[in-house]
Amino acid sequence: MNLSFFDQFLSPSLLGIPLIAMAIMIPWLIFPTPTNRWLNNRLMTVQSWFINRFTYQLMQPMNFGGHKWATILTALMLFLITINLLGLLPYTFTPTTQLSLNMAFAIPLWLTTVLIGMLNQPTVALGHLLPEGTPTLLIPILIIIETISLFIRPLALGVRLTANLTAGHLLMQLIATAAFVLITIMPTVALLTSLILFLLTILEVAVAMIQAYVFVLLLSLYLQENV
């Protein structure tokens, strides 16, 4: 019974063909593309306002060199939010609960920010490995610690997103199962459990959006250090 709770995190397949690629492509079909041939409706207006506000808040603390990343980070933000929210629907699959997918986003983007710093400002980039004013005896130890913390960054990005979404989905399934079992035995308790499930669902919607924002925000902070 305990193992069945994790079946929702298995990559679905049809006739031996994995369907995770279809789940990844669906978000791009949801957002309408602006065009000059038609007037913008309310959905397009809200979408444009959200993208502009997010891009402004993300790029404001950066210098001009980091503004080239605005399109990539905004697209990644919309992609993660859409996948996370679609995964809350019944009988759906959430690709971002797979650590492999999150690491596939985290490692290349983090590595790109590091390479940009090494190519453009090698002295400043290497200076991050040694805090200013460090005693001579602590220099080797601190360099090792800072190097390890540097390489842990992509792992922290991927694991944070995976762990939060996985924990939320498991908790929702546990409470939903309890409500379903108790509905014939103790209807009052089942009603209270359903209310808790409703509140938890609202919380998970917020977590789905917040975790996507945190993922992109941390990438922008890593980029800000190297541009």
Curated annotation (Swiss-Prot):
GO CC, any one term: proton-transporting ATP synthase complex
Query: InterPro entries from the entry?
Result: ATP_synth_F0_asu, ATP_synth_F0_asu_AS, ATP_synth_F0_asu_bact/mt, F0_ATP_A_sf
- What are its GO biological-process terms? proton motive force-driven ATP synthesis; proton transmembrane transport
Q: Would you identify the family this protein belongs to, as annotated? A: Belongs to the ATPase A chain family.
What protein name does the entry list? Answer: ATP synthase F(0) complex subunit a
What gene does this protein come from? MT-ATP6
The catalysed reaction is: H(+)(in) = H(+)(out)
Q: Which domain of life is it from?
A: Eukaryota
Principal location listed in the UniProt entry: mitochondrion
Record key words, sorted? ATP synthesis, CF(0), Hydrogen ion transport, Ion transport, Membrane, Mitochondrion, Mitochondrion inner membrane, Transmembrane, Transmembrane helix, Transport
* Membrane topology, as annotated: Multi-pass membrane protein
Q: Where in the cell is it found?
A: Mitochondrion inner membrane
Molecular function in Gene Ontology: proton channel activity; proton-transporting ATP synthase activity, rotational mechanism
Cystines in this chain = none
- The protein's assembly and partners: Component of the ATP synthase complex composed at least of ATP5F1A/subunit alpha, ATP5F1B/subunit beta, ATP5MC1/subunit c (homooctomer), MT-ATP6/subunit a, MT-ATP8/subunit 8, ATP5ME/subunit e, ATP5MF/subunit f, ATP5MG/subunit g, ATP5MK/subunit k, ATP5MJ/subunit j, ATP5F1C/subunit gamma, ATP5F1D/subunit delta, ATP5F1E/subunit epsilon, ATP5PF/subunit F6, ATP5PB/subunit b, ATP5PD/subunit d, ATP5PO/subunit OSCP.
Pfam families named among the record's database cross-references: ATP-synt_A
Q: What does this protein do?
A: Subunit a, of the mitochondrial membrane ATP synthase complex (F(1)F(0) ATP synthase or Complex V) that produces ATP from ADP in the presence of a proton gradient across the membrane which is generated by electron transport complexes of the respiratory chain. ATP synthase complex consist of a soluble F(1) head domain - the catalytic core - and a membrane F(1) domain - the membrane proton channel. These two domains are linked by a central stalk rotating inside the F(1) region and a stationary peripheral stalk.
Please tell me whether the keyword rRNA processing is annotated for this protein.
no
Q: Which residues cross the membrane?
A: 14-34, 69-89, 99-119, 137-157, 180-200, 202-222
Record PROSITE patterns: ATPASE_A (PS00449)
